[in-house]
């Protein structure tokens, strides 16, 4: 009887645990309780030399009048090799926020997809979208969960931006590998070419930029980053490959069409050719 009672108690505890996991508004928490092996982070790697993996490089973001913009180049590198010229590093997190990734590409893309599901799951369970602050905090917790792998060389550093209806303005958040979250008030950049992109934005960004002017500044800053950082790919005129750029306003997120970016790139090239500068 005692063993049967213990068995019932154990089964009861399992049922309670499963019900609690199923009712949580956090999909990541549910997964960590029911199938932790499916999470892209929080697992130790076996000892040995890490193989080379593709890395995403430069992301830029800035506020403008009525919203926020995020842009990323198209190159992924693996050591000294170009792993991809077509990679996309900026994604819509939901209808009113976007996410840019730098670092280990495979992990970063998995975390991005998990974050998208996390926001969708919360809205379905709670019946209302998570606030922008809440989204930023959830992303920070996910980055913190990847810390064991970051300490082994597989770091993911995101950039998060969205429109905050409570403040009627775009907001921008950066992170470190420990999940620390920092709000950036004007513009920011992450990745190997970030120091050059940030220098360009310091000169070109100004308060009250229009959306079209912000797109110009983003393209200029990625041009500068690619000029000095071999891991950042500039606009590719031969292959007609332009950066991926999203804007987020009160009306939601919008991906800038490639044909519009082609026109912007041509204007930037003409302007730089007219200056005739070496660097």
Swiss-Prot record:
Leader sequence residues: none
Which positions are listed as propeptide? 1-56
Q: Which GO terms label this protein's molecular function in UniProt?
A: threonine-type endopeptidase activity
* Protein's UniProt keywords contain Isomerase: no
Predominant location of this chain? cytoplasm
Activity regulation remarks: The formation of the proteasomal ATPase ARC-20S proteasome complex, likely via the docking of the C-termini of ARC into the intersubunit pockets in the alpha-rings, may trigger opening of the gate for substrate entry. Interconversion between the open-gate and close-gate conformations leads to a dynamic regulation of the 20S proteasome proteolysis activity.
User: SUPFAM superfamilies from the xrefs?
Assistant: N-terminal nucleophile aminohydrolases (Ntn hydrolases)
Q: What class of enzyme is it?
A: hydrolase
* GO annotation, biological process: modification-dependent protein catabolic process; proteasomal protein catabolic process
Q: Which PROSITE patterns match?
A: PROTEASOME_BETA_2
Task: Write down the NCBIfam families for this protein, in alphabetical order.
Answer: 20S_bact_beta
**Protein name per the record:** Proteasome subunit beta
Q: What is the lineage of its organism?
A: Bacteria, Bacillati, Actinomycetota, Actinomycetes, Micrococcales
């Amino acid at each position: 009887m005692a063993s049967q009672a213990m068995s019932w108690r154990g089964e009861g505890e399992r049922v309670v645990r499963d019900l609690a996991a199923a009712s949580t508004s956090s999909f990541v928490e549910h997964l960590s309780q029911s199938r932790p092996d499916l999470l892209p982070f929080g697992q130790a790697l076996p000892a040995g030399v890490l193989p080379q993996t593709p890395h995403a490089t430069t992301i830029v973001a800035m506020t403008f009048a009525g919203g926020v913009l995020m842009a990323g180049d198209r190159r992924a590198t693996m050591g000294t090799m170009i792993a991809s010229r077509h990679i996309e590093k900026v994604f819509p997190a939901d209808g009113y926020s976007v996410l840019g990734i730098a670092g280990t590409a495979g992990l970063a893309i998995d975390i991005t997809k998990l974050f998208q599901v996390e926001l969708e799951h919360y809205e379905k369970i709670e019946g209302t979208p998570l606030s922008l602050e809440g989204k930023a905090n959830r992303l920070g917790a996910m980055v913190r969960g990847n810390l064991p792998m970051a300490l082994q060389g597989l770091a993911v550093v995101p950039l998060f931006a969205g429109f905050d209806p409570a403040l009627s303005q775009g907001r921008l958040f950066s992170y470190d590998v420990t999940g620390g979250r920092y709000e950036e008030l004007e513009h920011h950049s992450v990745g190997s070419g970030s120091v050059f992109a940030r220098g360009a934005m310091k000169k070109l960004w100004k308060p009250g930029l229009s959306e079209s002017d912000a797109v110009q500044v983003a393209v200029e800053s990625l041009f500068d980053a690619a000029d000095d950082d071999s891991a950042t790919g500039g606009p590719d005129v031969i292959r007609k490959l332009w950066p991926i750029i999203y804007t987020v306003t009160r009306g939601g997120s919008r991906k800038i069409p490639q044909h519009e970016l082609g026109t912007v790139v041509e204007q930037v090239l003409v302007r730089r050719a007219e200056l005739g500068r070496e660097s």
